Structures are given as C-alpha cells and as structure tokens.
Amino acid sequence: MGQSKRPFKNKEEKKSRGFGRSRHDDAGAGGRPQVKKAVFESTKKKEIGVSDLTLLSKVSNEAINENLKKRFEHGEIYTYIGHVLVSVNPFRDLGIYTDKVLESYRGKNRLEVPPHVFAVAEAGYYNMKAYKENQCVIISGESGAGKTEAAKRLMQYIANVSGGTDSSIQQTKDMVLATNPLLESFGNAKTLRNNNSSRFGKYLELQFNSVGEPVGATITNYLLEKSRVVGQIKNERNFHIFYQFTKAAPQSYRDAFGIQQPQSYVYTSRSQCFDVAGMNDAADFNETIEAMRIIGLRQAEQDNIFRVLSAILWLGNMQFQEDDHSNASINDQSIIDFVAYLLEVDAEGVQKALTQRIVETARGGRRGSIYEVPLNTVQATAVRDALAKALYFNLFDWIVQRVNASLTAKGTVTNTIGILDIYGFEIFERNSFEQLCINYVNEKLQQIFIQLTLKTEQEEYAREQIKWTPIKYFDNKVVCQLIEDKRPPGVFAALNDACATAHADSGAADQTFVGRLNFLSQNPNFESRQGQFIVKHYAGDVAYAVEGMTDKNKDQLLKDLLNLVNSSTNSFLHTLFPNRVNQDDKRRPPTAGDKIKASANDLVTTLAKAQPSYIRTIKPNDNKSPSEYNVANVIHQIKYLGLQENVRIRRAGFAYRQTFEKFVERFYLLSPKTSYAGEYTWTGDAESGARQILKDTSIPPEEYQMGVAKAFIKTPETLFALEHMRDRYWHNMATRIQRAWRNYLRYRTECAIRIQRFWRRVTGGLEFIKLRDQGHKILGGRKERRRYSLVGSRRFLGDYLGISNAGDMGDVIKSSINISSGENILYSCRCELLVTKFGRSSKPSPRLLILTSRNVYVVVQKFVNNQLSILAERMIPIGAIKFVSTSNLKDDWFSIGVGAQQEPDPLISCVFKTEFFTYLTNALRGQLNLRIGETIEYNKKPGKLAVVKAVKDPAVPRDDVYKSGTIRTGPGEPANSVSKPTPRPKQVPGKPITKGKLLRPGGPGGGPSKLAPRPKPVAQNLPENPRAAKQPAGEKFKPVAQSVTAVAAAHARTNSGSQNRPPPPPPPTQPPAPKKDTAKALYDFDSGRSNELPLRKGEIVQVVTKESNGWWLCMNLETSAQGWAPEAYLEPIVAKTPSLPPPPPSLPPQSKSAVSNTLPNGPSRVNGAAAKAKPAPPAPPFKRPDINRKAAPAAAPRDSAVSMNSHESPAGSGRATPSSLSNASIAGGLAEALRARQSAMQGKEQDDDDW
C-alpha cells in the first residue's frame, strides 16, 4: 500500500509509544522508572494546523480546505492523509529542497519528520530494499498543480540516497537526472495555467540491483501534444526548445540552418508570446546541450536533431496562395529550396507533396488508376502542418528511445521504482480530441486510486471478515467503460466506426460520429448536444467539440509525405520514419484512440505490479500567485480528488496488512518461540505464529485484527515499532557477537600476558641475576658482604632512580645536568659524598650517583631562592677513571680515583656499590682497576693521596659510621659468600583467566559452567570441649595476637565449666572519632589572591593539609571556605591528652605452659612490631600547591635507606656525626671547634686534617 515501514530512529520514540519495552526499561535505581529530564525545545517549529488530515476533529471538504489554506499561508505546502501526500503549489521557492533538508529525511520514517516529498521518496526506496517489492509513485492533479516539480524532487532524493561509489552507478544517476532538462525542453511549454506545463505524460522506471544501487532506467512517454507545434492560443508558447534554439543557437547552427529569432517564424510567433517570467531561454539551452552530452548523444546526433527543428520552423513559414485555377501554390520558392536542403530531398518533390495529393482507384480488388489531385490552400496548409507535427512527434519519440538506450541496465535488475508524471485533468472553453485522451488517462489513474485505496480495501475487509463500517464513494469505473468499451460501444469505438465509414470526407465522418453517439444517450454519465457531447468525469462535466475529432483520431500521415521522407538522403530521417509505405496493406491502421487505450491499459498493468504511493497536487489559484488562495477552486479539487473519502477510510482502516506467512517470515525474530539465534523454529501454522509474535511483542489487541488469511495492523506507529524491534534484534545480535569476540580476544590477551609474565620471570630476570653473579666475581672473595646483598631475590636492576624513563623526573634530571641523548643510562642511585667544610669535620652529604655509557655524574639537589636546583657537581668521563678503591669489610664506602689536577677524588657511600662496580666494569669492557684492602685510597686534595681506614667494630648499630678518617662497621658475611637461591613465590589460588561471562571455565573449549546448588544449613553436633574440634585437612592453625589478660581470661572460662558461666561483658564502646587539627591565627593575613584564605588575629581555623614548604591548606569554620595560609601566621592548637584508664584487675596465676600453648610468641611479636618506628618521609619541594590540587603524598623511603633530604645537615645524612655544636652560638661554637681540632691533631701532620 506504499506505507513507509521505516522503524523508529531512537529508543525514546519507540518507548514513548509503548512498544517493545523490556522489563528492565521501567526500573532504574531503586526500582523506580527512569524519567527523561524535560527540555524546552525553543528551536522546534510550531506546527500549523495539522500535518495529517486524519487528525482533523471534523472531516469535511471545508475543514480540509481550511487546514490546507492555513498551512499554505505559512509556507507549509505538504500535508498527509495517512501515507498519501497532499501538495499545494506555492508558486515560489521555499528553500525546502536543499541538501541539508534532504539529509534530514535520510533513514527517517514519516512520523519522525514533517510532511515532504522527500519522505515519500524515502518510504518508497526503503520499502523496495526491505521488502524486495517494486514501488511506484503516482502524481495526480490538474495542470499547474506541481506534478513535474514533485517528480523532479523524487528523482533528486533517490539519486542522493541510493548509494553506490562505482563510476557506472554514478553515471547512471547523472543520466537519470539529465533526462529532466532534456525532456522538459522538448515536451514542456507555457500555457495559460502553467509556465512549465508538461505537454506529454512520462513514466520513469528506475531500476536497482539487489543492494539498492541504480543500474538503469526506462522512460515511457504518453500523449505528446503535437498540435502545439503548429498553433497556440494567445499568451501561450510552443515547446521550450524552439525558443531556446532560436535565441541561443551558436553561430555555426545559424549559418548552416538559417536560424533567426523566434519572431521570424510563424510557428513561434503566432501567439505573440516570446518570453516567460522567471525563465531564461538562453541559459536553459546550454543546460539542454549539457544534458545531451551527459546522456551520451554524439555531436552528429545533436546536429541532426537541430536540423529537423530548423526544417519544422521553415515549414511553418511556407505560405500558400490560390492560382488561376483556385489551387494552392507556394509564393516563395526560396523557402521550398531551403526546406528541401534541410530535409535533403528534391525541391520539386517538396512542392508536389505539399500542393498535390495522389489518389488511387481500385477495381475488383485490383490496383486501378492513379490521379494527381491538386489541393486548395486550406488542404495544403493542413498537409504542411501534418508534416511538421509528424516530424516533431517522431523526433520526440526518437529522443526518448535514445535516452532509454543510454540508460539500459548495466547489471542485474532486482526491483524498480516508477514515477508517473502525466497531464493533469483539463477543462478548457473548447475541448477536443486531445482533452478527451488526457482526461481518459486521468480517469484510469483515478480508477487505480479508487481500487487500491477505497474499493479494494473495503472488499478485502469484508473478505477477511474484519470488523468494518462501509464508506460510500464514487466509483468511476462506469466513466472509463463509457469511453473505452467495445460492447456496448463507447466513445472511442464510435469514433473508430465513423472514421472507417466516412474516411474520405472529414465533415461526413464527424456527422457519422455524432450519429453513433446517440446510442450512448441512455448512459447517465453522457449527454449529447448540438455539435458536442458531455462526459461526466470524476473531476467534473466536460463538453467536447465533435468537429475535427475524426481527423485527429486517424493519426495517419499521407502516403505522399511518407514517400517524400523516404526519398531523403539523410539516414536520420529514415530512423525517424522506420515504417516503409506498404501499398498492398489493406488493414486499417490503429487509430490514435486505439493507441491511447492500449497505452493506458499497459500503464495500469505496470502500476498494478508495484506498491503505489500517492502525491495529490492542488493548484491554489489560476494566476500563479504565491499569495492568492482561491477557496472555490481548491474545494472543487478536493472534491474530485476524493480527499474527504480518503480521510474517512484512512481513519477507519488499517495501515498495514499482510498474509500470515509473510508476516511470520518478516517478524519471526521478535518471538523466542518462533526463532532461536536467527533461525526459524516455529512448527505450528502461520496464523498461530503471527498471534504468538504479536503477543510476545506486547502489541495491544486493539491495535490489530486477524483476518482469514491476513494480519491487519491498525496504526503505522505499531508497524514502525515492530520494524524497529526487528532492526534492533540484528543490532543486539551483532553486539552479542562483538561482546563474545572481544571477550575471546581479552582471554587470549590475558593468556598471552600470563605466559609473557612467566617467561619474563624465568628469562627476563636472568640478565639481572647474571649481573649479580658477575658482581661476586668482580669482588673475588676479597670483601665481606652484607646480608642484604646475598638474599636470593636481589637483582641488579641498575636504574633505580628511573632516569631513563620518559616523561618523569628522569627527564628533568637529564635536562638539568645536560645528559646527551647518545648516552645510555646504566646505573642510578642515591648515595652520600664526603664533603669537606671549612672549620668543620668532613661529613657525608646526600647526592645522586649516575653512570652512563660515557660519564659518571655526581648530582646535588639543593634549594636556591626557595627553588629546587639540580646540578651536576662532578662529571667524570669513565675513560679518566684510574681505579676504584674500597675496603675489605662490609661497609658501603668507595672512592673513584681520577687524579685530577684541580679536583679531589670523590669518596662515596652507596648501598649498591657492588652493582656500581659491575656496571662500571662492563662500561669499561672489563678494564676496571678495583682495589680492595684494609684502607680506601683517594686524593683528598689534588695530587695528595690519602687513605681512610676501615675498622671492624661490633658495637656499631648500623651498617657503618664515618668519623675522622675512619670507617667503623660491624662484622659481615664471609668474603667468599654467594647469593642464596631465588626463593619460590608464595602459592596463591589462581585467578580466573577472564571476568567475561561468555567464556566457559578454563577458557574456550572448557566444560560447561554449572552452578552448584547452595547447600541448606543443617544442625551439627558440636563437641563439648572446643579443644577437641579437629582442624580441617590442609588448614594450618594461625595464632592471633591477643593480650595476656584476654588469653588468661579465655583459658579460665574454658576450664570453668558451662554451669557457672559468668554473664557476657558489655560491648566495647565506639572509638572516639579522630579529632581534626585546628590552629589559631597569630596575625592578620589578607593577600587578595583567590587561592589564599584571609585570616584575622585570634581566629580559629581547621587545618586540612600541612605542606612542608611553609603553607597550610585551611578551612574557615564559619563559611567553610578553603585556601592556603602561611604556616608562620598560625599556631597549632594541641588537644589535651586524656587521662589513662585505670589498670585492669589482676588475673589469677596461670602456668607458663598454658599461656605458651594458647599464644606462642604472641606478646613478643606485638612488642617487637611496636618498637620499630618508620623513618620520617622526605620533605617535599618548596612550592606552594594550587588550592584545586590535592596535596602530594609523602614519598615512601627507598630501599637504599639513604635520605633524599638535600639540606646538608647531620640529620639529612643519616650517619653518626658529632652534633655537640648544634645548640651553641656561632662564636662559641667556632672556638670550641678550633679547640677540638687542636687536640685531635696532636701528633699528626697537617695533611691528615679532617676538620
């Protein structure tokens, strides 16, 4: 029925209509429906009237007219009647056919967008692709109502959305669009009602392949008004091509064909109308030439076309006058010669064909005598006009055939979309044979509309036993029978009989025709009057003049003219007139009425094979005014178009009907009982399958009815919902497949990662283990080892500071100390450098030690003007290193012997010294001179060698302590010790390969997942003595740390028995909430910055975050405003320590064995853990953080146990150094230091001064 079956575009629209909801759609958080937030649509255009006439509160012709008028006045020219589009000609450009508007209709059903011809095109194209059914669009309405424009817009839309990037497909699209300007030039003309009136009918059939790409097209033309070639009424014009050609012909054509302006030719000047408002003939001529090029007409073919047009124009200038015998003669011989030149025939033959007629007499079936009968001026003029009309008519037919040849399908044709653009219904002051044929074809189209939308629909409801209230309508079948029937004879039959009876005399034939019409006087739709007859058409009563009808019906060219054309040497003329004159053929040739009737029936048959869509065009006024709306004329069109009846049937009818078999075939995916994984599984009959589908999709019973063989859907919204659910099924299946595939890919990735992780664990760490073992060999059993150096999990990782990591602190350090990109970072670690200070003892100071493939860097970090500065304190090329010296004890000190003339050798303490030796050895390709002895040698000053003694002292609490040139360290592991085996990792339960729900346990190919039922609780018999309870197999007892009091109390309760059990103690009280830090403002503070908190003296604020850079993040207790405040302006408020609770009561004496059995080593572990205190985190850089950024967490301590603190103080070094001068004044401290130096240097040389 041409109904658009395009689904809803989004879920919200579908759900708003109540279709296809899942049980999860109505429940959100807490089980409440999720209601979409309302948004004011300020840009939405307010609807004028109703966009669908079925929504009118009152159905009448006046109500329909009022709605159309209201919409017309506001520029809304399109309105629906269900799926029928009503279009009112605006006579102006509304800007509604742009590419942007076109794209807005792509992929939308008609309910989602305003009424438009693009929506009809989209529905037809979608239905063709989705249902594999041929489609057609029937455009009807009177002349000037906008049928041709609607057809052009349909072609525009289909060409844009039909896809296809292949060059041949694009060429087909271009050629189809090019047919519009070409055929309009040759088939359209200006009339009183329409400046671009189609004077022929056209059925364009677009051909598509299986994927919806256009592969070809065919055009069938009907009823070309060839009489317009030789005459027009005032203020009308000939066909457009004559004015385009005469105004814009190139000079070559003017010279070859003698072309002049249109005022010079009788056929183009008779009506004295040469120009049309809003039309540029010269520009249109160029567009016509371009269309010919696109379609593929060669230059020779174009030349022949314009040669024939020139001959027609010059034929019209051939005037006749009477000679002495009252016979016709041509007064201008030059015109005869030029016409003969254009037709490429003999000039004498032209003169004879136009002024004489050859008559042949027959006797007894034999050929008789042949006479040359001269013609009078009237007869000669008629022969001239007949030749001109025949030339143009055959030329037009040839152009259509040539276009079809270019548009021949270049692939397999699967489906078609037809567009019918034909004459509208015509009623003039004088109506002749042309109007009878045109109105007859419109009656046939109206009959199709009635049969498919009114009669057939109601008959189908009755046949299918659907509840239905019949609606009365006018069936125009009787009018069609009046014109076309043979028994009893209709108008065409009577006309043919008159032509056959009195074929020689036109006047006698017309009178015979009038006599035959008297037999039709009993028909209620026919009236006969003097010299005319009236037919009561569906669009109104039309009076037709009898005069000249028989001649027009004969539609025969005189044999004299055919002989003239056949004598031409121009092969193109022979192509235009392919039928040779058969002198012996006695059969009556088909008349014009016969041809029209056959064409109309063929058209009806073609349309019946397709699913039709309808566009009903309405002309608002006869003056082509963009503002005038003639109510009387519009109501007349509403009546004869049957819009009121169409509205009533659409309101009471069903939007969609389909056989049970096709319905189930289309929608079986929507029910789990009729399909599984896309496969059809229904085993019952088709009717029950259709009912099951409608039931499972929650379609209300009032929205459908089940007939005898078909399912009927009432509203298009229901159909759109079904289509949307069907489309979403495939989307959901695709999503499930994608989810399964992504899950499988994730599974494979996780498996690969596990394998890679295991392989790296096995092989990736071997390199670092080899380096560690190489370190043992480098030491060569000459140095005692620390226990940490020998643990099995120790690896020589090298770059502990991450200097080589991009985008991290490493980039900052590399750029600060100018490490080139060609240097590979081999080793980096924190260390301490022995630094000599004037007037003070040498002390270790924190540094960074970096080894590259070229240099050794000693990097210092310090604050300069409250900014962290990173400097390369020392850069030593590895080639300049003469030796590395270290002691034979377990201390971490070593020196790098360079022997520079300006700088001393560095003496460094680094916990990863052996690793440094290893990487340095590799960098030097094994040429490192490693000196290991009881002392460490180094140049304390340039050119002055000094030694540092290493002394073993078991009393040293830490690894080693440096003081006054001596390193004291505890005993270490034997020098020949090697690393212990790598410990096996802790056995933990294996994690699942993936968290996906679509994979079986163990990955693809595993056994099916079966959920074990949850066991029900069963009463168990517990032993009286809890100690006797047996531990489960494989589960070890884990002691829990408890206080001695609790253990003793538990032991006492266990031995006391169940009869004298004391009451349970009260539940412990909730621990107090942690108190928030507060501070009191000592001074007023108001900087005016947005990220700083103003303070008033004495004000109490809450401290949120304390930064070590001198700024605290505080919050005002009254306004809750947060901001940064200087630490110096605040005094923390220390909360009073609450008094300790009284000690617990003493316990009864317990045996040691009981306590030890209950909790082995429990108290000692607790106390030991509490005794160890974590080291303080390093201070962050001095930078005030932004208020919107979280404070940086404190950095975790490194494994090296070397502080990051860059302040050169004893506390920063972490070493045991003298601190007796820390609390003295500067002068006093200096004097005391000098006295200490003097006593320490007694008996020593000046070079041994460490102070």
UniProtKB/Swiss-Prot annotation:
Location of Phosphoserine modifications: S369
* UniProt keyword list: Actin-binding, ATP-binding, Cytoplasm, Cytoskeleton, Hydrolase, Motor protein, Myosin, Nucleotide-binding, Phosphoprotein, Repeat, SH3 domain
Cite the binding residues for ATP.
G141, E142, S143, G144, A145, G146, K147, T148
Q: Which residues form the SH3 domain?
A: 1074-1135
Please note every region of biased composition (Low complexity).
Answer: 1040-1052
The organism's superkingdom is given as: Eukaryota
Q: Where is the composition biased (Basic and acidic residues)?
A: 9-27
Mod. after translation: Phosphorylation of the TEDS site (Ser-369) is required for the polarization of the actin cytoskeleton. Phosphorylation probably activates the myosin-I ATPase activity.
Which spans does this entry mark as compositional bias, Polar residues? 1150-1161, 1216-1225
Where composition is biased (Pro residues), the residues are 1061-1073, 1139-1148
| IQ domain ranges (all copies) | 731-751, 752-777
Q: Where does the record place the region Actin-binding?
A: 416-498
Subcellular location field: Cytoplasm, Cytoskeleton, Actin patch
Where is the segment annotated Disordered? 1-37, 958-1093, 1135-1227
GO CC list? actin cortical patch; cell tip; myosin complex; plasma membrane
Q: Name one GO molecular function term.
A: hydrolase activity
What are the TH1 domain coordinates in residue numbering? 785-980
Domain (Myosin motor) spans 48-727
Gene Ontology BP, a term: actin cortical patch localization
- Tell me, what does this protein do in biology? Type-I myosin implicated in the organization of the actin cytoskeleton. Required for proper actin cytoskeleton polarization. At the cell cortex, assembles in patch-like structures together with proteins from the actin-polymerizing machinery and promotes actin assembly. Functions as actin nucleation-promoting factor (NPF) for the Arp2/3 complex.
Domain remarks: The myosin motor domain displays actin-stimulated ATPase activity and generates a mechanochemical force. The tail domain participates in molecular interactions that specify the role of the motor domain. It is composed of several tail homology (TH) domains, namely a putative phospholipid-binding myosin tail domain (also named TH1), an Ala- and Pro-rich domain (TH2), followed by an SH3 domain and a C-terminal acidic domain (TH3).
In which family does this protein belong, per the annotation? Belongs to the TRAFAC class myosin-kinesin ATPase superfamily. Myosin family.
Please state what the protein is called: Myosin-1
Q: Lineage from the top down?
A: Eukaryota, Fungi, Dikarya, Ascomycota, Pezizomycotina
Gene that encodes the chain:
MYO1
